[in-house]
Amino acid sequence: MITNTAAYQFAPIHDPQQLADSVLERAQQRALKGSVLVAEEGINLFLAGDAEQIASFYAWLHADARFAQMRVKYSHSAEQPFARLKVKVKPEIISFRRDDASPLQGRAPSVAPAVLRKWMQQGHDDHGRPLVLLDTRNAQEVAYGTFQGALTLPIDKFTELPEALQPHRAALADATVVSFCTGGIRCEKAALWMHAEGMDNVLQLEGGILGYFEDVGGEGYDGRCFVFDERVALDAELRPLVDGAACADAGKI
């Protein structure tokens, strides 16, 4: 059984290459595979391997004060979903190219999965404001599933979101907007940018879709959540669509 993890943390990294080298060394020692991006703004990890080795790696990373509060999201598969280990230094851990959306200057307010589930059941937030769920992912991902009634955008990459959102701004003015994505990293930057643009009633979904599945299940969500590895997508119980030879409905959305 393979333990799969997704985690990120925005934090000032003064020497990204040094951190990347340390991560690579310790992940290799534990025979982990996956993808890690390091930048001056933080770290973004998708790693998979033996459960004990995964626990040891994250114990090492959590011992660094910059990552002590980093949430790790877990799922399992019979097969290793990554072919190799890649650790790279990039300008951003998720490319957005907006100076007015830096998480190092402060986080956007968030909403917990259980609270969002309650709001969806009510049809409004706790103040009676209408609720709009904003999917910040690209069209390929959305095709596998999204929250019921979510506002989706015809984008192929995250950097296209600001322009694609412009026609909807007036309709969002009187609503409480909850931005969401796979694991939280894109919706965090999107929420910050929206606040910088004067859209004050914007929250990010804490932990993203995977955090929602992990905490409260799939209520209010239709379909699966696309992931960028050989599993292709996960259902609300975090089971992979494709898992080596064991892949019922493989390739189906």
Swiss-Prot record:
InterPro entries: Rhodanese-like_dom, Rhodanese-like_dom_sf, TrhO, TRHO_N
Protein name, as recorded: tRNA uridine(34) hydroxylase
Gene3D superfamilies (UniProt xref): 3.30.70.100, Rhodanese-like domain
HAMAP family, per the entry: TrhO (MF_00469)
All residue ranges annotated as the Rhodanese domain in the record: 127-221
Active site residues of this protein: C181
Function, as annotated: Catalyzes oxygen-dependent 5-hydroxyuridine (ho5U) modification at position 34 in tRNAs.
GO biological process per UniProt: tRNA modification
Sample GO molecular function, one term: oxidoreductase activity, acting on paired donors, with incorporation or reduction of molecular oxygen
Entry coiled-coil feature ranges: none
Reaction(s) catalysed (UniProt annotation): uridine(34) in tRNA + AH2 + O2 = 5-hydroxyuridine(34) in tRNA + A + H2O
Enzyme class: oxidoreductase
